[in-house]
Amino acid sequence: MKAMRKILAVGLLAAVLAPATLLHADSEDAGFIRIQPEDIPWVDAPGYTGVKMAVIAGDPSKPGVYVVRVKFSPGVMSRPHFHPDDRYAIVIKGTWWTGTGDTFDPSKTVPVKAGGFMKHPAGAHHFDGAKDEEVILQLIGMGPGGTTMIHPEDGHTGPSK
């Protein structure tokens, strides 16, 4: 009975792994994206003083999954805004300060440390950024994305104090 179980287990394992091995052999490097930290294509985020961004994968302006990195300079925070898509944020470097609501108030922000995660639900009003150190985030969303400022007259970014 034990021998039969072993044979069945090995057979099942082979059946599961064989297609994966064949798939790997057929797709060697096809579609993979590798970017080293020093090669990240940072650009100034349009309209956001003190913020840089880099599109890592996909295109936030088109339908489909996208991955973007955002870098806040020390002392820079966004003003209240929202996005049309859910966004999933992972803090890569620094402590990211996050607040919710229509009124910018850095004293009411909550820290998310490097390695931490936060979901921004579509349409949820929020503001975020850096206080005393540079912050780098990785954002994942489903395009088309965008940003709508709650108080456009206040600009997109400003001091975190």
Model-derived segments and spans:
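Short acidic-glycine-tyrosine-enriched beta hairpin
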Residues: 96, 102-123
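A short, N-terminal "cap"/entry segment at the start of jelly-roll beta-barrel domains
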Residues: 24-66, 153-161
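Double-stranded beta-helix
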Residues: 31-33, 107, 127-161
